[in-house]
């Protein structure tokens, strides 16, 4: 039996309003629990369009057929009009998710975090995280115990900033196994549970065809030598490609692969490491990457 952490990122208004209820129904039918990370502030995802001037981002949008993948409402959100606030407008959906699944913070403003947090000072970052946590806690009526940085935009500054909130774990980076990042003080910080597997949009049209994706992914899962963690998006697997996700769950069960919330992957003893800026194929710009202590 292979256990895989299932992380669901919710980036936009439509992903919350339409994608999450569909995913909740699918997961219930398959008796699966996951970790769902919500963006709760304004939906400004359309402001990423300026990145089309960057060849790598443009190619990603073209090969993944972004217009049909996400929909024009997501691709234009927050451009010609102010972005709609996601959290309180979809409070019932978020509360329903929290009844059955582990719920954490993805971002207050997903676009702002992904586009600008790398240049924020620590206090600006702390204030932004606090705003998101406060809003999510108001909605679900209980403490939030985990978070996942939008776009995996995380480095040492993010690690230090999140220590102020005493969360159980964060999932801010890409890597191989859960670990504790070393703080500037020399002490171990809050546990990190890295994502180990590629997302749909990172590989479709580059490494694999859409119709071959599930078999390709299951092969990666079964060959994973670390602690497999897979991320889906409410805007993708909860909308245009929900049928692919259902097929993945059926095929996974046949292969002896089970999915679980990320917290089930934690252990009492974890190795030490760091989160450093790096790059991965299929994703434009830098993101947080796991570096085990002592490695280079």
Swiss-Prot record:
Give the Gene3D superfamilies listed for this entry: Glycoside hydrolase/deacetylase
Q: Which HAMAP family does the record match to this protein?
A: ArnD
Cite the InterPro entries for this sequence: ArnD, Glyco_hydro/deAcase_b/a-brl, NODB_dom, Polysacc_deacetylase_ArnD
User: Which segments constitute the NodB homology domain?
Assistant: 2-260
EC numbers listed for it are 3.5.1.n3
The family line of this record is: Belongs to the polysaccharide deacetylase family. ArnD deformylase subfamily.
Q: What class of enzyme is it?
A: hydrolase
Listed GO MF terms: hydrolase activity, acting on carbon-nitrogen (but not peptide) bonds, in linear amides
Name of the gene this protein is made from: arnD
Q: Which GO terms describe its biological process?
A: 4-amino-4-deoxy-alpha-L-arabinopyranosyl undecaprenyl phosphate biosynthetic process; lipid A biosynthetic process; lipopolysaccharide biosynthetic process; response to antibiotic
Per its record, the protein catalyses: 4-deoxy-4-formamido-alpha-L-arabinopyranosyl di-trans,octa-cis-undecaprenyl phosphate + H2O = 4-amino-4-deoxy-alpha-L-arabinopyranosyl di-trans,octa-cis-undecaprenyl phosphate + formate
Q: Which CDD domains match?
A: CE4_ArnD
**Which named protein is this?**
Probable 4-deoxy-4-formamido-L-arabinose-phosphoundecaprenol deformylase ArnD
Keyword Magnesium in annotation: no
Q: Which organism is it from?
A: Shigella flexneri
Task: State which pathway it belongs to.
Answer: Glycolipid biosynthesis; 4-amino-4-deoxy-alpha-L-arabinose undecaprenyl phosphate biosynthesis; 4-amino-4-deoxy-alpha-L-arabinose undecaprenyl phosphate from UDP-4-deoxy-4-formamido-beta-L-arabinose and undecaprenyl phosphate: step 2/2; Bacterial outer membrane biogenesis; lipopolysaccharide biosynthesis
Q: Which UniProt keywords apply?
A: Antibiotic resistance, Hydrolase, Lipid A biosynthesis, Lipid biosynthesis, Lipid metabolism, Lipopolysaccharide biosynthesis
């Amino acid at each position: 039996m292979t256990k895989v952490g299932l992380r669901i990122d919710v980036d936009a208004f439509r992903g919350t309003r339409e994608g999450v209820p569909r995913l909740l129904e699918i997961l219930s039918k398959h008796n699966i629990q996951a970790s769902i990370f919500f963006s709760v502030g304004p939906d400004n995802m359309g402001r990423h369009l300026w990145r089309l001037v960057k060849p790598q981002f443009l190619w990603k949008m073209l090969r993944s057929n972004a217009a049909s993948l996400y929909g024009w409402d997501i691709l234009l959100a927050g451009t010609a009009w102010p972005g709609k606030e996601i959290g309180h407008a979809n409070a019932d959906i978020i509360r329903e998710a929290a009844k059955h699944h582990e719920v954490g913070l993805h971002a207050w403003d997903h676009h702002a975090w992904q586009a600008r947090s790398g240049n924020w000072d620590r206090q600006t970052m702390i204030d932004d995280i606090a705003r998101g946590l406060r809003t999510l806690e108001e909605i679900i009526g209980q403490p939030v115990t985990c978070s996942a940085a939008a776009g995996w935009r995380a480095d040492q500054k993010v690690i230090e900033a999140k220590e102020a909130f005493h969360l159980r774990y964060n999932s801010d980076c890409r890597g191989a196994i859960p670990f504790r990042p070393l703080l500037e003080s020399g002490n171990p910080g809050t546990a990190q549970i890295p994502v180990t597997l590629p997302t749909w949009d990172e590989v479709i049209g580059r490494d694999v065809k859409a119709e071959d994706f599930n078999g390709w992914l299951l092969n990666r899962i079964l060959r994973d030598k670390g602690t497999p963690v897979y991320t889906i998006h409410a805007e993708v697997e909860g909308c245009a490609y929900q049928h692919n996700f259902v097929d993945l769950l059926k095929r996974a069960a046949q292969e002896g692969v089970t999915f679980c919330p990320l917290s089930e992957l934690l252990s009492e003893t974890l190795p030490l490491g760091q989160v450093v800026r790096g790059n991965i194929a299929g994703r434009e710009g830098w993101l947080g990457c796991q570096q085990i202590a002592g490695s280079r």
